């Protein structure tokens, strides 16, 4: 097994900072459509020239308000076009962007501001303005119309000369700080990672070099992930640099509806969105009394996806006649409708921010929408590895991007060195153990195959050491259970215990649908009202019997010592605003287990 793999050399480029990406597009394609704004009448196009002019006007306002080169600007807003303006305008003025997740608690907002000391803040709406003001932010301006809105900020800078903006634009070099991005904090407190201009432009160039079939001038994408997350901002910069049209949609409930209007060719998604799309197909089939037929179609799609994967490196591979006929039949009946649901133009999806179930990856490839899996962290400026078209392997997160090296330490930890790796943190203490021999320690466990493809096996901090000394990585078991549409999150527990048990956090909407369709209406009252902080226990016999199936399947796939002997089913707040869920919908494991400790104890006392 390989211990190290490197991507190709990064192609030479002349970009010194992130604003050079925009300046280059203004020079080469000023009238090309860079952004689309969703309106009731349709999409309102914004050219590269128009975006650049708006950014420069906003930069003048920031300068007029006293922003100096190197000063920090906090941005707290949902994903929207004005976020992109704020990002580039701050850099044009010589500032450093500090994103604040719009779902942050008051304590988190206060901690972010105290740790990074921004001199000015840009808020999405009144609720974000109030959150920033209450946390002590100075000079707060809002993106929504109001007395201190972006129009007023722009107006304040009318006397700032164009030459001053251009002078400041050229100040930052590759080693200068561009943004301070907080980690998601799934297992520990958030850390404020420094991302330089060199990190940003290097990763943008690497992405364009690695995926020219995906990132190009004729491509269109919807950005629905939080722009406070480095993955979404990296995509936005890559799209801007390559000429890809970007449309923002900050309301997750409207993303599927945006497909028909925007008709994207590519999207970065989280696995939960893919599951929702598949579930939409199931729901429509059930409504048409075709549920069993759709289940057969799902099986066919997965089999077809596996065939396509095998055929990548074996030109002689042929599907069975039965599979080919079944796929053609279900394509007419279901698959083309699912593609139409996504706008009927999607060529590629990139899944990031959380592990993707291989079966789900095969399903989407089987319906004609291949999924590229990638891997990265805040500290690697998002992608460090990724699968390539022509070499899609479900369960793998691909080979290193150009300019990046992956090493596997003796204990299995994934180490990263390369163009996107952070130089450190705002609090130097956070970086004391972050590097070894020039490589960043990711905290993830993984392995490399002979072709240099990386597989992630779990988090070091999530390892469970049982009373017998057995080390158990919980992620494989948890991933198997969450294949059930009823389960939003599964958590294996058993640190210093004689055996393992599990907590299943259910999806209330999925449970509601199951209850209505399975003839168990007495489950519905159990879902009413807001659950307590530690979750509400659901002990309905039929529901528990239904949940036992995915638990049994997961147990069958692991050794006896890694099996859960009992489980508890809970409903809790699992939206992005939950204190237990990150903005990218990953579970904050330690915080949740602490809140659910009473439920866990019952698994060992009964």
Question: Each predicted region: which residue ranges?
Answer:
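Conserved ATP-binding/catalytic segment of the ANL
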Residues: 400-466
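Conserved AMP-binding A3 loop
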Residues: 45-49, 178-204
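Conserved C-terminal "lid"/linker of ANL adenylate-forming enzymes
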Residues: 489, 544, 548-606
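Structural core segment of the AMP-binding/adenylate-forming
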Residues: 64-65, 92-156, 546
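Conserved ATP-dependent adenylate/AMP-binding module captured primarily in the ANL superfamily
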Residues: 87, 102-135, 203-222, 252-266, ...
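Conserved pre-ATP/AMP-binding loop-to-beta segment of ANL
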Residues: 30-33, 158-182, 189, 214-220
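Conserved AMP-binding/adenylate-forming core of the ANL superfamily
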Residues: 34-80, 84-88, 105-110, 114, ...
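Conserved AMP-binding/adenylation subdomain of ANL enzymes
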Residues: 201-220, 227-335, 345
């Amino acid at each position: 097994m390989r211990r190290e793999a490197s991507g190709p050399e990064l192609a030479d480029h002349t970009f010194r900072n992130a604003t050079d990406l925009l300046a280059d597009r203004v020079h080469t394609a000023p009238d090309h459509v860079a952004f689309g704004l969703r309106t009731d009448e349709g999409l309102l196009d914004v050219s590269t020239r128009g975006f650049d002019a708006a950014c420069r006007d906003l930069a003048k306002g920031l300068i007029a308000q006293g922003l100096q080169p190197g000063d920090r600007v906090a941005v707290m807003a949902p994903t929207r076009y004005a976020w992109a303006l704020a990002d580039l305008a701050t850099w044009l003025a010589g500032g450093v962007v500090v994103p604040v997740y719009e779902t942050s608690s008051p304590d988190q907002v206060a901690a972010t501001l105290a740790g990074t000391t921004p001199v000015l803040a840009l808020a999405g709406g009144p609720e974000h303005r109030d959150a920033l003001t209450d946390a002590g932010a100075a000079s707060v301006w809002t993106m929504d119309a109001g007395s201190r809105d972006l129009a007023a900020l722009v107006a304040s800078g009318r006397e700032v000369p164009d030459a001053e903006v251009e002078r400041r634009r050229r100040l930052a070099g590759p080693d200068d700080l561009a943004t301070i991005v907080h980690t998601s904090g799934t297992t520990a407190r958030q850390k404020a990672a420094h991302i330089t201009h060199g990190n940003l432009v290097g990763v943008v160039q690497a992405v364009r070099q690695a995926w020219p079939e995906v990132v190009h001038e004729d491509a269109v994408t919807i950005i629905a992930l939080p722009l406070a997350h480095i993955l979404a901002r990296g995509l936005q910069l890559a799209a801007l640099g390559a000429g890809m049209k970007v449309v923002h949609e900050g309301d997750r409930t409207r993303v599927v509806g945006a497909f028909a209007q925007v008709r994207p060719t590519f999207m970065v998604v989280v696995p939960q969105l893919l599951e929702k799309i598949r579930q939409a197909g199931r729901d429509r089939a059930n409504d048409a009394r075709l549920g069993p037929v759709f289940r057969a179609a799902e099986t066919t799609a997965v089999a077809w996806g596996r065939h396509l994967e095998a055929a990548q490196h074996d030109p002689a591979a042929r599907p069975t006649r039965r599979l080919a006929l079944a796929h053609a039949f279900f394509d007419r009946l279901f698959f083309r409708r699912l593609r139409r649901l996504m706008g009927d133009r999607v060529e590629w999806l990139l899944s990031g921010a959380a592990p993707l179930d291989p079966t789900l990856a095969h399903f989407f490839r089987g319906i004609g929408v291949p999924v590229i899996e990638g891997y990265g962290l805040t500290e690697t400026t998002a992608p460090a590895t990724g699968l390539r078209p022509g070499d899609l392997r479900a369960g793998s997160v691909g080979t290193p991007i150009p300019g990046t090296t992956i090493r596997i330490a003796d204990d299995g930890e994934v180490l990263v060195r390369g163009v996107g790796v952070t130089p450190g943190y705002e609090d130097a203490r956070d970086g004391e153990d972050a590097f070894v021999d020039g490589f960043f320690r990711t905290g993830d466990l993984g392995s490399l195959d002979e072709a240099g493809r990386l597989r992630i096996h779990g988090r070091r901090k999530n390892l469970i050491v049982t009373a017998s000394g057995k080390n158990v990585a919980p992620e494989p078991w948890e991933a198997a259970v969450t294949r059930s549409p009823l389960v939003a999150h599964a958590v294996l527990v058993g640190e210093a215990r004689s055996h393992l048990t599990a907590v299943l956090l259910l999806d209330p909407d999925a449970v509601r649908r199951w209850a209505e369709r399975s003839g168990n209406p007495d489950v519905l009252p159990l879902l009413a009202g807001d659950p307590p902080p530690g979750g509400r226990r659901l002990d309905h016999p039929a529901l528990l019997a239904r949940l036992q199936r995915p638990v049994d399947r997961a147990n069958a796939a692991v050794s006896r010592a890694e099996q859960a002997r009992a489980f508890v089913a809970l409903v809790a707040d699992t939206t992005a605003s939950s204190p237990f869920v990150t903005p990218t919908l990953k579970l904050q494991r330690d915080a949740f287990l602490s809140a659910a400790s009473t439920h866990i104890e019952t698994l060992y006392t009964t």
